[in-house]
A protein has these predicted regions:
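Double-stranded beta-helix
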Residues: 2-11, 83-119
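A short glycine-rich, His/Asp/Glu-containing loop-to-beta-strand
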Residues: 4-42, 46-47
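Conserved strand-loop elements at the edges of beta-sheets that form or border functional pockets
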Residues: 21, 42-44, 51, 70, ...
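Hydrophobic/aromatic beta-strand elements that line small-molecule binding cavities or substrate pockets
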Residues: 30, 49, 71-72, 82-84
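Short, conserved beta-strand element in jelly-roll/cupin
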Residues: 30-33, 42-59, 99-102
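Glycine-centered loop/turn positions within well-structured domains
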Residues: 38, 47, 57, 66, ...
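Short acidic-glycine-tyrosine-enriched beta hairpin
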Residues: 63-81
Length: 119
């Protein structure tokens, strides 16, 4: 699936950002505590768009590490190897808005590495 276009619309009262329109998707807010991280993982049946809700996140994507700023978007195509973490010095959890696109269930995850014994 191609990455959906993010639409920014200015209004007299402010603005809104639209991430999906009339698309089957699952929307979550991921919260990762300081010094913690999710499994290094990939998915076969879903693409994901992550939007940083505040600073402090650390994202690994296909061998590269980045620290997205609040509002920054990251596209995770199906099959990409990725993980979310939170810098130990962040002082607060990292939160990511996750929009998953595709036909899948929660078993659509291949854990490649996991600090909690689930790989």
């Amino acid at each position: 699936m191609d990455r959906p276009e993010t639409l920014h619309v200015d209004k007299p009262w402010g603005s809104f950002d639209q991430y999906a329109l009339n698309t089957a998707c699952t929307v979550k807010i991921l919260t990762c505590g300081p010094g913690h991280r999710l499994s290094l993982q990939r998915h076969a049946h879903r693409d994901e768009l992550w939007v940083a809700l505040e600073d402090g996140a650390e994202v690994e994507l296909d061998g590269k590490t980045m620290s997205p700023r609040k509002g920054e978007e990251i596209w995770l195509p199906r099959g990409s190897v990725h993980r979310l973490g939170c810098h130990a010095s962040a002082g607060q959890p990292a939160r990511i808005l996750e929009i998953s696109l595709g036909s899948f269930d929660e078993n659509d995850i291949e854990r490649l590495e996991d600090g909690y014994g689930r790989a």
